Each structure stands twice: as structure tokens, then as C-alpha cells.
């Protein structure tokens, strides 16, 4: 089990700082920079008439393969402790929108031309696009929710100058917790203290409901809590 920290800001916006990545055979889910990547492989077709055409066709095949891999990876993304994207994808509208979004994936780096004449290409999509599709169309923030008009736009600001707490870092290392796009934080009585309704839709799409970190040092430098965050140990 990988160790990580998550951070709740003073406005109850959540961030798990950098470095938490789920590596897969065909790509990765980076919960730190909120991105999903997949590697596609293309082989030179036998009907290519010249080297230039062979390369173009191999790149096209690699992209198509990466799109298929991205769909597979997105299906496995954890939404909450109990659900994955595959559950949401049974909805035809969501399925169509997600597939359309994935078709707009951007290449990462340059193609890798392998000794067996195949080509590898990496493509990536931001989690924000997935959030924009699966989150309810309207989430009305309360005055203290991140993203509401009454919430501070920048962390640290007045609270830091006044010596107040700028955020809460919950140390989840050693727990059976796993990264998710939209986890809930519960108190010891099982009551939700962070989750749906505690943040605006706009905030969740633009910033992510959560972020991740492997180290306390990285968490303390996160811009949403930087200044004077407190650290609390998670218990379950």
C-alpha cells in the first residue's frame, strides 16, 4: 500500500499533493496532476507503399490503440471508496460524452520507434474533463464552499496575515485508504465532513475535488493550504 497524505483547505477544498500515481500496464492515473495517460502501439501495415506512408499509418494505429486503452483505464478510475467510473459508464449519455472527450486526448512527448518497426505513442486526458461530465449540472455552494463568491480566491491571504489556520492536512499514511476522484471524509461517528455539497461544481471541475501527496513537506507547500496548515492524523 502506497503512503500518501491528503489536505483539506480552510474552505474545505481538498487536495492530495504531488506524487501519487497508479501505474498500469497500459498507462497511468496521476492523482497529483489530475491526469490519465495511456500508451498505444502501432505496427507498420503490410500494405504500406513506402516508408512515409508506413510511418503515418503506424502512428494512426498507435493513436487508435491509445484511445481504446484510455477508455479501459477511465473505466477503472475510482470515484469514491465504493464506486468506479465503470458504474457511471453504464449510462449511455455519460458513456457517449466520455468517449467523445477521450477522442480529444493530446499526445505526450514524441513517438517511440521500436526495433520491431512498431511505434509507441502516449496520450493524456485531464481528469477535469471527466469531472465535468459526471458531476451533476448544478451544485449550489454554501457561503464557505470553495468556488463560492464568499470564499477566498487565494489560499493563505488574510488568514496567513492574521495568523489563522490556512488549511488542514490529514495524514492518511498507514491507513487502508486509496486515491479517488471524489472521496468523502468521515468523522469517527461515520458522519461526512467533506464530500458532495461541500464544494461548488466549478471548484471541483477546475481544481479537482481532491489532490494527493506522499510527503508532509509537499503537502505543506500546496498553494491551497500554504501558510499555516494544521496536521491531523487519520484514524480509519
Feature map (PLM): residue ranges:
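Sec-dependent N-terminal signal peptides
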Residues: 4-13
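Domain-level marker for long, solvent-exposed, non-transmembrane regions
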Residues: 17-236
Amino acid at each position: 500500500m502506497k503512503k500518501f497524505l491528503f489536505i483539506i483547505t480552510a474552505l474545505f477544498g481538498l487536495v492530495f499533493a504531488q506524487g501519487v500515481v497508479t501505474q498500469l500496464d497500459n498507462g497511468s492515473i496521476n492523482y497529483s496532476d489530475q491526469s490519465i495517460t495511456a500508451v498505444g502501439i502501432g505496427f507498420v501495415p503490410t500494405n504500406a507503399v513506402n516508408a512515409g506512408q508506413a510511418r503515418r499509418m503506424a502512428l494512426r494505429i498507435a493513436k487508435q490503440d491509445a484511445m481504446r486503452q484510455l477508455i479501459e483505464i477511465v473505466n477503472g478510475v475510482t470515484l469514491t471508496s465504493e464506486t468506479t467510473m465503470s458504474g457511471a459508464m453504464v449510462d449511455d449519455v455519460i458513456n457517449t460524452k466520455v468517449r467523445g472527450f477521450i477522442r480529444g486526448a493530446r499526445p505526450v512527448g514524441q513517438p517511440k520507434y521500436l526495433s520491431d518497426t512498431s511505434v509507441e505513442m502516449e496520450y493524456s486526458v485531464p481528469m477535469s474533463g471527466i469531472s465535468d461530465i459526471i458531476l451533476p449540472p448544478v451544485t449550489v455552494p454554501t457561503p464557505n464552499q470553495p468556488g463560492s463568491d464568499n470564499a477566498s480566491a487565494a489560499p493563505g491571504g488574510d488568514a496567513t496575515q492574521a495568523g489563522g489556520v490556512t488549511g488542514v492536512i490529514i495524514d492518511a499514511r498507514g491507513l487502508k485508504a486509496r486515491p479517488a476522484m471524489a472521496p468523502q471524509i468521515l468523522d469517527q461517528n461515520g458522519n461526512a465532513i467533506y464530500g458532495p455539497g461541500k464544494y461548488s461544481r466549478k471548484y471541483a471541475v477546475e481544481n479537482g475535488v481532491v489532490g494527493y501527496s506522499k510527503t508532509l513537506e509537499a503537502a505543506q507547500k500546496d498553494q491551497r493550504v500554504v501558510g499555516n496548515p494544521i496536521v491531523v492524523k487519520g484514524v480509519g
